[in-house]
Structure formats: structure tokens, C-alpha cells
Amino acid sequence: MTISSLSAGVSARRNSLNNVDFLEISFSKPRRKCTRLPCGLNVRQAVHVVRLLATCRRDLRRRTLAYAIPNENDEAKKAASHDCNLDTMALHLDNNASSKYSDVEVVASISCLEDDISQSIENLKSQGSILDKLKAVHLHLLASERWNASRLKLCHRHYSDSARNLIHYLALRCLDLEQLKEDLSCTSLLNLESINSYILASLTAGIQLLDNQKSSSLNTQESILYQEENGNFMIQALGKKLSANKELLLGPLRHNQTNHIMVTVGQEASESEISDILKAGASIIRINCAHGNPSIWSEIIRRVKTSSQMLEMPCQILMDLAGPKLRTGNLKPGPCIIKISPKKNATGNVILPSQVWLSHKDAGPPPSHLSPDAVLFIDDKKFLSELQVGHILKFSDARGKKRMLKISRQFHFFSGTGFVAECSRTAYVQSGTELHRKGKKIRFPAAQVVDVPAVEPFIRLRVGDLLTISRDSSCEQDESSEPISSAHRITCSSSCLFDSVKPGEPIAFDDGKIWGLIQGASISEIVVSITHAGPRGTKLGSGKSINIPKSNIHFEGLTTKDLMDLEFVASHADMVGISFVRDSCDIAMLRKELEKRKVQNLGVVLKIETKSGFERLPHILLEAMKSSNPLGVMIARGDLAVECGWERLADMQEEILSICGAAHVPVIWATQVLESLVKFGVPTRAEITDVASARRSVRTSWPVAFRLKIDEATSASEILRASCVMLNKGKHVVEAVSTLDKILHINTAQMKADLMKPLLPSSHFF
């Protein structure tokens, strides 16, 4: 129904200001927001209305004061006003029955209505049916709780309320509530989409408010308000549960921060780089146990703790167990050589010489604010101590070509001295290359380049190529030079892969960068036809992920390596990440191992990265709640997207966030966050908006009587969806952490207010 033109004016006399607080205009379109106008203002503005409501201080109930309908001649006519309460008490404001509210004058006119407005008014007075529906839903939730009573009793007392709320959430999701949501939205009573953290208490509050409207007795009303205060206490407690669990798992937030930043580091991260990462805003460091060994992990942890203590910035450590992940085997390493190449223009002329860092092998990597094109370590400290800016070093590269390095800058730092040298021609430098300092008559002693890393081996796959995956490591392909044929070979040591796949099933590599179709399979080899790769081919190296989303694969929960690594993690880390969680059996096995090691305070982060893990998440959480260990969930979007499909990732991510919100479990949002910025120094537009969704909030919709206390419980009624955002390691990770910190903690309310100021001609609307 639409109203082409309706003018309504309401003027309140001065003697009515002590009674009437607000006038509310309800629009003909149910989805339109109601406009509340302070009394004492004369409104002469054309609006599309169906009814006018007034709220009085002496009575919390809202009543319909007037509405207008057309007569046969399409002339405006004031109709009898109806109370909006469930008892449908009428307040007639015609000429004969207006003495009680004589201080309110209503003027209304209407020109055209397409449908009969009376039907719309009847729809607006549907609170009785809403109350019945809410009570039915309330009973359904209680029945579900009783049905799962035996399961809830097994949960640790710390998680008992959270487990109950999770059961209520699941019971609510089983119902078709679209019509009820629509009705609640029209009445501005409750938003079922934003009550995940305190479902039963929210429904109780809504029911109490509707029951309150049915009663006109002051004593009854006071009794109900007392009950509401008790209900608010329950809402407050549940509202603070997520914040408490977040601090228990991730540690306290720094000043002015709203959520944590986690950064993955490897053995290449120096102490100075870790310090820069912490200063930029990171509060959690992640170590991936799939790479390295206990000695490497110990050194990383030492650097982290040293930096944290020096900066007086608390930092938690998360160690991810490798889990039963399928990965490509090792290719034969390439030569220990590095290419130094200056930047050239389209015609091949050098426009910028290559920047090379020179230092002693024990000095560590260059300072984080430098981004050299190559790093060369020298074995002779005396040779370095005699170098000065302007000196020239001559050498013969791996091809026998004569090349030179010119020292342009010198740096002194706590671990030694380093230099930046410029090279104007392409050179290939290998371990053992001799550097000679150029002199007019004196021949200076030479120094050798050492510890040049081996070239990372890879195979380049194109669409149509055949790839053979072998179980036998002796079948490794030597990739020192790319083969001319389209047949490639790589290994995988996991027997699960060869026992699970069948011809015709898809297979993905490196987080979905390469896709193929299995042509044949045996107990020792799998032949794959590549169906998706980059236009110029895509590199596939050692240790890259393998996913078989359509195959029926059976993994063990914790591998033998995981159990060995857990010994180290339990004594050195604050949190342990459990990779590729598939069902509650994996969690039961983990709980036994943690009980065996008596580590009740070790945080447990469940990584959801498989289809079965997503589908069984509620059961997994309830199983994890049987222990007292701090609990969290990581959304590993890389494997999850490959396993379940790119088109489903956004919806699955939202569902995980909703389930964890109902269980009061903090969420870590991970994989490819600001990846372009981390790797190349420049973010994409999509990455920036992607990160912004991590701080997206759900604004709860509540009755006025309850809103204040709920706001106190949920920090101005905003619930952060992700408690922590994770960045992977990369060349520009410090800059990425700083950018992420600014995006996550920007004052959006102040920013929106500043944006609106030029659009507002005056601070007075009327």
C-alpha cells in the first residue's frame, strides 16, 4: 500500500510537555524506520504515515493518538484512534471523547490511498501473535536444552553457560523464523540476527516487554521491571563472556586497541625485525611447526621474548602443529647462487643500479628499513672494517664475467657494520666468489662470499601438462633446468593420498593455484592432467599443499610428529594450533594428550580448514569445552576455500563467526590478509575492504528499557566479529602490520561524523 500524499501536523501545547515525551511517526512501508520527534516542536512536513504514536512519562506504553483514512469523496477524515497495546484499549480523539487528551491537537489530511488503510493498521497491531510466537520459540529452546542435558553436564564449569547458549543458537537455527523476523523488525522490538551471544535472555526480555504492554497495573509493571533487571544481569554476564574468553586466550589488549594482530615469523626473522613488528602493533607471534625443528623454534622464541621485554610489550606465542596435511615432497636443491640484476627501461638501458647489502656472516640480515635487491655475507671482518664509502670491489661472477660493486652507504648497528653497494650490470654470485678491493698500486687481500642460499627448486606447470606424483623419494626430478617435455614428477610421502583418490577426481596444489584431474592411480603413483594454471604456467615447489576435496580421505587426528612437537609446545608456547580438525574424535584425542602433560592453561586454537570440520563445528566446540583450556577458533581460509569451493567461502566464514559468537569463543581470522602488501609493498583495494570486514560489528536492536545495560555489557552495543587478525610473513610485513593496525582501530564513529559535517547546513533540523 502506498500513500501519494499525506500531510500531518501535530502541535503540543505547553501544558502537555510534562506528560508527552515523544511523538513517533510510523510509515506505511514496514521496513522504513520510524521517526521520533521531541515534543514541543511544530511539525508541518509532508510525510507518508499510517499512525502517530505518543509516549508519556506517566505511562511507558505507547498509544496511537490519531490516524487518517479517506471517505468516499476522498476527503480527509479523522478516525478513532486505537491503542497499540495488546488489550486494544481505545483512545477516541473525536469531538465527543477527547477530554482526557485535550492537550494534544492532531491535524491530518489525505488526498489519495490505493488500498484500504484499515488492513494495514490491523497488520501493525499484531503484537499478540508475536508474543505467542516468541513464547513458542522460548519453549523450543528450553526443550532443546533438556534434550542435550547429558551433553551439557560434561562441559567444564567455565564453559557451561556458553555451551547452553550454543545449544540455544542451534535450536533457533532449526526453525523457520523469517516471518517472525519480519514482524519483530516492523515493531523495532528485537533483531534475531544480533542476539547470538545471549539468545534465551534476549527472548525473555522481548517476552517480558510484550507482557508489560498487556498490563496497565502499576504494581504489575513494577514487578515486571524487577524481573527485567534480573534478566539484564544475565545478559550482562553473557555479554562479557566473550571478552573474558578472548583475554584468557589471546592476552590483554594494548591501549586503544580493539582486537589483536598475529604475525607468522620464521627463522629468517631477526631480533630487530621482531621488535619492529611488535612496535607496529602485533601482539601475538605464530610459529608453524611444519617448518624447522625445536632448535630453530627455541631461537625464534628467545628473540621474541627478548624483544617483548625490551619494549615492555606483552606478546603471546602460538605454535601450529603441522597436522596430517598433504604436501609435495622435496625437489633436489638447485645451485647456491644469487642473481643481481639492475632495473632497466623498455629499451634495456639501466635506470637504477641494483642495491646489494654487504656484511659479516654473523651480523644477521640488514636493518628492516632497508630493502636491498640482494644480500651477500663476507667471511673476513678485517676486510669489511677497512671499507669506506666510494670504494670499488671487483669480482668475476659464476659465468666468468667481470663485474664491480661500488660502496654507496655505510651502517653501524649493535651486531656489526654493514654496507650498501651498487651494481650496474647483471651478475650471478655464488659461494666462494672472491671480492677484490680496487687500488691504484697496492693489492689488497681478497674476501670470499659465503652462505649463498640454494636456489629454491620448482617445476612450472601449464594447462595440459601431465604430473606424476610418486610415493618413492628416489624418483625426485632434478629441476636445475626445466624439462622441455610436458611430463613432470614430484613426490608425496603420505600414504593417505595414494589410498584415497580415484580416477576422475579433482586435485589442487598450493592453495588452489594449480588444479588437475586424476587420470590414473596406483599404490605408488598418481598421474594428474593439469586443468588450471597461469597463462605462462605456475610454479610448484617443495612443501606445497595438496587438496583432494572430492575424495574420501581418512586422517588421523594427531600425527606422530604432532605428538613429538606437542612436548616442546606445551613447555614453550602460550597457545597450540590444531590443524585440519575434522570431528570431535580429534579433540578427544587432544584432550587426553593435554591431560597427560597436565597443561590446563595452554590455549587451544582449532583450525577450521576442511569441509567436515566446518559441518561438525558445534560438536567439535562442545567436545573442546569439556576441558578448562582457553579455547579459540582459526578460520584458515586458504584450505577451506579449496576444500569447499570459492563461491561458498564468504557464507561459511559468516557461519563460523556466528557459531563461535554463540559459544563465546574468540575467532582468529587468517590466510592471505593484505597479502599483496606483505609481499610487494602495495595493497589491493579488495584487500583493504577485506580487512575492514574483520572489524565489522553487529549493532543489536533492543527495546529502550533494556538498551542501556546491554550497551554496558557489550561496549556500546558493538561486538567485534574477529578477535584477532593474522598476517603471514613477507618482505613488507612491518608495513603491513602498521597498516592493519590503523584499519582495525580507526575511530569509525568520529570519521563518519567528520564526513557528514559539510553536508549539514545547520545543527537545528526544525
Please describe what each predicted stretch is:
Residues 2-12, 21-24, 29, 40, ...:
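Non-catalytic helical/linker scaffolds that mediate oligomerization, partner binding
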